[in-house]
């Protein structure tokens, strides 16, 4: 039995969920609307203010889809209600970031500044020059965009320079020791 899949999803006030033919789920809330095509092999039932995901058989495919489908639905409900955010931190001499309209401009030690356009449904805030906050209602888009920003300069293990998530711990290495 899937421990995650059997948990009911509670729909908070102000969030509206509609399940169409073939498990096309639309979730509307105060922050926006998300639509996702989920696996048609599972049964998604809506009762008053809860959603339940049930699987028809106990074969391996249905077991694996059970928890996944439930988590995707829960992420949609949480996203339209409260939203998701990822915080990034720039460490290094001269590493800076700033917003220019819908563009993110970063100085990361290259010969040119790195410019990134905010994708649809994602907002990036720069409270100061060394912090970035990626916000949105779709958890996958927020995570992917934060990872794209981080990929420009991953943190290196010697001094910790680069772009890292705020809660990320970098395994540090000791540098070379000179002859004595």
Curated annotation (Swiss-Prot):
It holds the Pfam family Ribosomal_L6. Keywords: Ribonucleoprotein, Ribosomal protein, RNA-binding, rRNA-binding. It comes from the Bacteria. One of its GO terms (cellular component) is cytosolic large ribosomal subunit. GO terms for molecular function: rRNA binding; structural constituent of ribosome. InterPro entries: Ribosomal_uL6-like, Ribosomal_uL6-like_a/b-dom_sf, Ribosomal_uL6_a/b-dom, Ribosomal_uL6_bac-type, Ribosomal_uL6_CS. One of its GO terms (biological process) is cytoplasmic translation. SUPFAM superfamilies: Ribosomal protein L6. Part of the 50S ribosomal subunit. NCBIfam families: L6_bact. This protein binds to the 23S rRNA, and is important in its secondary structure. It is located near the subunit interface in the base of the L7/L12 stalk, and near the tRNA binding site of the peptidyltransferase center. PANTHER family: 60S/50S RIBOSOMAL PROTEIN L6/L9, LARGE RIBOSOMAL SUBUNIT PROTEIN UL6M. HAMAP family: Ribosomal_uL6_B. Belongs to the universal ribosomal protein uL6 family. This is Large ribosomal subunit protein uL6. The gene is rplF.
């Amino acid at each position: 039995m899937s421990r995650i899949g059997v948990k009911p999803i509670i729909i908070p006030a102000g969030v509206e969920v509609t399940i169409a033919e073939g498990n096309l789920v639309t979730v509307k809330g105060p922050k926006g609307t998300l639509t996702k095509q989920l696996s048609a092999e599972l049964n998604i039932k809506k009762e008053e203010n809860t959603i339940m995901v049930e699987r028809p058989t106990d074969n391996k495919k249905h077991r694996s889809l059970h928890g996944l489908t439930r988590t995707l639905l829960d992420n949609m409900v949480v996203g339209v209600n409260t939203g998701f955010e990822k915080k990034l931190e720039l460490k290094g001499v001269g590493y800076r970031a700033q917003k220019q309209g819908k563009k993110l401009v970063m100085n990361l030690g290259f010969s040119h500044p790195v410019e990134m356009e905010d994708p649809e449904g994602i907002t990036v805030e720069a409270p100061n020059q060394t912090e970035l906050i990626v916000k949105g209602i779709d958890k996958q888009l927020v995570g992917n965009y934060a990872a794209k920003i981080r990929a420009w300069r991953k943190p290196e293990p010697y001094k910790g320079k680069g772009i890292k998530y705020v809660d990320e711990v970098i395994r540090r290495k000791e540098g070379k020791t000179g002859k004595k």
